[in-house]
């Protein structure tokens, strides 16, 4: 029996391996989609900072309500250049691995200097039963337990706010475009963008639909012809 089952399982595994290997023909789609997702995010962030440069520089340098960083005008300029130029380069797939480095640094600075004290979530969960922190709290992680307690309080505040709006406001109109949430402003987005940029740093912009690919291809054909 075993002599019949094992060869069949091996043949089945080989077929699946062949099918998965065939998908490598379109492996350029993954880095392409990462670039198309990240590029407008970075360009929009840089554009917003550039359009409000004085306010951005003031926020970088102010100790009371800002980041309290030295040389705020210089740092604001560097942040704007990194996001604007980096976003454009990501879009066309030029110098992708190089530009991923300053963009990752920007995400780390944002995560640790702006969002870290607010925890993980960008939008605060309002139901402890469905929070992704619940399994971690079950493992005895204190931060996860505090997150669940915060979720319960967020839920109470949202319920109170919705009650006031139903009683005194046009609730259906106010929520027509989406429900009210509590913005937590945690590191979730910065960490997610960092991970996506890290993938591009290691794997590059991808084949066919990136300038990097055609430069590399031209370079190899040039060196091979020598």
For each predicted feature, which ranges?
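Extended, low-polarity transmembrane helix blocks
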Residues: 2-55, 70-81, 85, 92-226
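Perimembrane loop-to-helix junctions flanking transmembrane segments
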Residues: 57-71
């Amino acid at each position: 029996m075993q002599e019949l089952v094992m060869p069949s399982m091996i043949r089945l595994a080989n077929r699946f391996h062949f099918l998965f290997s065939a998908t490598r023909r379109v492996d350029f789609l993954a880095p392409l989609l990462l670039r198309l997702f990240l590029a407008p995010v970075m360009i929009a962030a840089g554009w917003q900072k550039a359009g409000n440069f004085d306010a951005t520089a003031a926020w970088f340098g102010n100790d009371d309500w800002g980041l309290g960083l030295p040389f705020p005008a210089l740092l604001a300029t560097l942040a704007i250049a990194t996001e604007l130029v980096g976003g454009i380069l990501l879009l066309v797939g030029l110098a992708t691995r190089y530009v991923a480095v300053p963009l990752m640094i920007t995400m780390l600075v944002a995560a640790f200097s702006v969002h870290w004290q607010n925890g993980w979530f960008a939008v605060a969960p309002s139901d402890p039963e469905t929070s992704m922190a619940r399994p971690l709290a079950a493992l005895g992680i204190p931060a996860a337990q505090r997150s669940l307690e915060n979720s319960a309080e967020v839920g109470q505040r949202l319920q109170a706010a919705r009650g006031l709006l139903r009683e005194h406001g046009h609730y259906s109109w106010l929520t027509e475009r989406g429900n009210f949430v509590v913005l937590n402003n945690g590191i979730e987005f910065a960490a997610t963008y960092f991970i996506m940029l890290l993938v591009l740093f290691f794997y590059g912009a991808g084949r066919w639909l990136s300038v990097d690919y055609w430069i590399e291809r031209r370079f190899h054909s040039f060196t091979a012809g020598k």
